[in-house]
Amino acid sequence: MIKITLKDGKVMEFEEGIKISDIAMKISPALYKKALAAKIDGETVDLMTELHKDSSLEILTFEDEMGKWALRHTGSHMLAQAVKRLYPEVKLAIGPAIDTGFYYDFEADFTFTPEMLEKIEAEIKKIIKENHKLERFELPREEAIKLMKEKNEDYKVELIEDLPEGEVISFYKQGDFTDLCAGPHVPSTGKVKSVKLLSLAGAYWRGDENNKMLQRIYGTAFTKKSELDEYLNMIEEAKKRDHRKLGKELDLFSIHEEGPGFPFFHPKGMIVRNILESFWREEHTKAGYQEIRTPLILNEALWHQSGHWDHYKENMYFTNIDDDDYAIKPMNCPGGILVYKNSMHSYRDLPLRLSELGIVHRHELSGALHGLMRVRCFTQDDAHLYMTKEQIKEEVVGIIKLIDKFYKLFGFEYFVELSTRPEDSMGSDEDWEIATNGLREALDSIGKEYRVNEGDGAFYGPKIDFHLKDCIGRTWQCGTIQLDFQMPERFDLSYIGADGEKHRPVMVHRTIYGSVERFIGILIEQYAGAFPTWLAPVQVKLMNITDSQYDYLKKVEEALKENNIRVEIDTRNEKIGYKIREAQLQKVPYMLILGDKEVEAGKVAVRSRKDGDLGAISLEEFIEKIKNEIKNKTN
């Protein structure tokens, strides 16, 4: 008999060799029906996996991220199966699950069309009804190559040949279709209830523009049609809110072919950016942080010492200065560590909180670039805190409260994830246990709900990730708190303790916005470009009906500017209705309309983006109203 420990801590005994699907049935028929995959000792596996030793087990459903992933991974195989049925000459490349669905890359001597997608989707629905079992099998490397050559699948052969000699290669078979794959998958194609093919795109093989351009078909999959319908509605809403579209319409930023992945911020975009950064600085000063600035370019040796070389080398940019090799920083932490190391510290100096709005560069493949969301150059709102082990809990609680304050201000709900030690990690088991428990205790002490994401920590320590939920239900990972025992060791950091001896500090890496650029992109989409008054690039649009109000308009403009209200004037010889519509399209919070009546009464006619016509009031009254709104940062 073997002992299986369930997620809730309950221990059950079973015969050795039992399949996970059978355990799911014994736990609950309802769970068996919903089950898609499972985690055994933290590793995601198929439900048909047999268990031969004591293990921890978590049954995954569509409510779990890896459950979704397994279902959508199967969706990609069904897409490939449908394409091969309809167009046997097409060659298969790769087809993974992604955050919102799946895709598959194909080589074809024709171009897929939207009409062909409808035909392929109909074939997928047949495959769902056929309810094929997904069967995993393994072959030695040479036999795997032979199988794929027989099927004329050149890309699969290349993938296998890149694997080490002696590697056992896994495949999945469903009906008449077999694909090279590590899995996991759901038990049968019938588990995938609703599929929608969404779009077509080009994609270079292996993301390398020197390779052949393939055709990529994107799709998504759900266990219920209602969930699919909800997702499709969200996509339509997301198109309206696309920050790339709104960024252009509102003149906030642009991206040019001379610098793909390097955003250009326009004057209005800089207003938003500067407000966010000023607010960030104010709140950090209140919370006891000290701001630093570290260089963009640092000697390559520093990145070897920090360990980033082994993990980030492929995503770094390099240069040579005076015959020595340098790197453009992909992260701020090694530079911040040098600032700490520059002085001797006492236990009385700790915790030391150093913050930095530091520009970093990371190489992203051209196909992955996406407006402000995925760029090659961005500003990371970093802070690095140095403390004793006894201060971990209190400091992490303080960070969580600060992050909470920021996200609530912008109207975001969020959920928290505690990510534990990955396979590719540095440090001792003891340090990892202390670090993970420190984060867990901080979350528990303030009653913050969280989920555990096994094996997804940083290479130097466990972390808490904050996932924002926007107004249309999408999630964005922004803030993070990462506990680190490794960097202080690598850089020989120390402080003098109460005993007069040197001690090693604990280091915490922390962000709130994550990337300032990305956070601006998220805010554009969250607000659909209609920023709250305190954040709006233009807070008031001032417009006259005829030229006779021009002098009064200039006086009003001057009064608004004296009160630090961001105002633009529209004195064009256009109908007032046209001017109002244009201001509305520009998402300006307030319009002040000046006609002869307003001039005579010394008032302004106020139109609110949110509430419509507010009538005529004195300029002093309006200034007081808008200043209160700005001061209170009303959303």
Swiss-Prot record:
PROSITE patterns per UniProt: AA_TRNA_LIGASE_II (PS50862), TGS (PS51880)
Cofactor(s) this protein requires: Zn(2+)
Organism annotation: Clostridium botulinum (strain Hall / ATCC 3502 / NCTC 13319 / Type A)
All residue ranges annotated as the TGS domain in the record: 1-61
Cofactor stoichiometry and binding remark: Binds 1 zinc ion per subunit.
Signal peptide (residue range): none
GO cellular component: cytoplasm
Top-level division of the source organism's lineage: Bacteria
Pfam family, one: tRNA_SAD
GO biological process, one term: threonyl-tRNA aminoacylation
Subunit structure, interactors included: Homodimer.
Keyword Cell wall biogenesis/degradation among record annotations: no
The name this protein goes by in its record: Threonine--tRNA ligase
SS bonds (residue pairs): none
Localization (cell): Cytoplasm
Listed GO MF terms: ATP binding; catalytic activity, acting on a protein; metal ion binding; threonine-tRNA ligase activity; transferase activity; tRNA binding
Gene: thrS
CDD domains in alphabetical order: TGS_ThrRS, ThrRS_anticodon, ThrRS_core
Function of the molecule: Catalyzes the attachment of threonine to tRNA(Thr) in a two-step reaction: L-threonine is first activated by ATP to form Thr-AMP and then transferred to the acceptor end of tRNA(Thr). Also edits incorrectly charged L-seryl-tRNA(Thr).
Zinc is among the record's keywords: yes
Annotated binding of Zn(2+), by residue: C333, H384, H509
Entry EC number(s): 6.1.1.3
Ranges where the record places region Catalytic: 242-532
Catalysed reactions listed for this entry: tRNA(Thr) + L-threonine + ATP = L-threonyl-tRNA(Thr) + AMP + diphosphate + H(+)
Family stated for the protein in its record: Belongs to the class-II aminoacyl-tRNA synthetase family.
SMART domains listed in its UniProt record: tRNA_SAD (SM00863)
